Amino acid sequence: MTAPVTAPTTMPAQTPPTVETDVVTEAPRPLDDDILARARRQVLDEGRGLDEQDVLAVLQLPDEALGDLLALAHEVRLRWCGPEVEVEGIISLKTGGCPEDCHFCSQSGRFDSPVRSAWLDVPSLVEAAKATAATGATEFCIVAAVRGPDQRLMAQIREGVAAIREAVDINVACSLGMLTQEQVDELAGLGVHRYNHNLETARSHFPKVVTTHSWEERWETCELVRAAGMELCCGAIIGVGESLEQRAELAAQLAALEPDEVPLNFLNPRPGTPFGDLPAVDSREALRTIAAFRLALPRTILRYAGGREITLGDLDVQGMLGGINAVIVGNYLTTLGKNPESDLAMLTELRMPIKSLQATL
């Protein structure tokens, strides 16, 4: 197929956001053994997320404390989010050929990766949505590898969202890169339930991960989405060379943004990308990160996203018992995920009910 010419998205003129978590003005608190007790009082009892310094203290806990940490994060999830798990499927409408240089992504046209540009037609979108709904999922996200949508892509989204909503009883979400105000308004008018646009990593680390656009541009799109009344899905990719301090910084920045959902991706190093030789995140470190983000975001949907298979394997059950309350079923955009039956069996074994569509409306 012939790849479309992707028009650069013109971002609205806005003042770059000032995030209070960028600068710590108070004296650093000493790392102590009471962080879990403090988290129990503040997060479990009061529903207030940990700040950046306390998230860092959690990330620095020794392996011996991991069991207690996961148990606390699970209690927080149950108290403030409930026992249900939200299930989502995703589909790539436009794959590959992206003009951006996100160093972890094999869909960038700037890297020598095996992913080639391709488009999916509307009937295929509808069939994928039907298959997703058959798993019990309440969310179906249409994703495109672009800087932002051009006219062709918006026309395809217009047609695809209408066809899915007519044929399938499922919430439709989109992930189409950076948006203009006009595009945000149109997506909201189409009935798009949720929009995904990840911060990816901490503001201080972002220039080492992406150079073709700024962290502030991503933040601006997220703010536009929230203002338009769509639910905001904004998450992270863990393991892209960030320090623990920067991981805590990101958690605090996400808390300041207040998204409805935070998907946690773990780096699955892709051949041909600048981060293709980075190591996968250690499983214990990944579980600590999940729990730390739950303690920073006690009321937020925290979703398993890409990379959990290579990072955690069968230990992904521990993440479900350590703060996670949503999953993506099936394959990801360019990598394989677990088959849906395996994930659904895991939820059944854990006696975790799947959130009904009515509960999301």
Swiss-Prot record:
[2Fe-2S] cluster binds at C141, C174, C233, R303. The keyword Metal-binding applies. SMART domains: BATS, Elp3. Its cofactor is [4Fe-4S] cluster; [2Fe-2S] cluster. Pathway: Cofactor biosynthesis; biotin biosynthesis; biotin from 7,8-diaminononanoate: step 2/2. Binds 1 [4Fe-4S] cluster. The cluster is coordinated with 3 cysteines and an exchangeable S-adenosyl-L-methionine. One of its GO terms (molecular function) is iron ion binding. Gene3D superfamilies: Aldolase class I. SUPFAM superfamilies: Radical SAM enzymes. It catalyses: (4R,5S)-dethiobiotin + (sulfur carrier)-SH + 2 reduced [2Fe-2S]-[ferredoxin] + 2 S-adenosyl-L-methionine = (sulfur carrier)-H + biotin + 2 5'-deoxyadenosine + 2 L-methionine + 2 oxidized [2Fe-2S]-[ferredoxin]. Its EC number is 2.8.1.6. Keywords: 2Fe-2S, 4Fe-4S, Biotin biosynthesis, Iron, Iron-sulfur, Metal-binding, S-adenosyl-L-methionine, Transferase. Residues 83-308 form the Radical SAM core domain. GO terms for biological process: biotin biosynthetic process. [4Fe-4S] cluster binds at C98, C102, C105. Homodimer. Catalyzes the conversion of dethiobiotin (DTB) to biotin by the insertion of a sulfur atom into dethiobiotin via a radical-based mechanism. Belongs to the radical SAM superfamily. Biotin synthase family. This is Biotin synthase. The lineage of its organism: Bacteria, Bacillati, Actinomycetota, Actinomycetes, Frankiales.
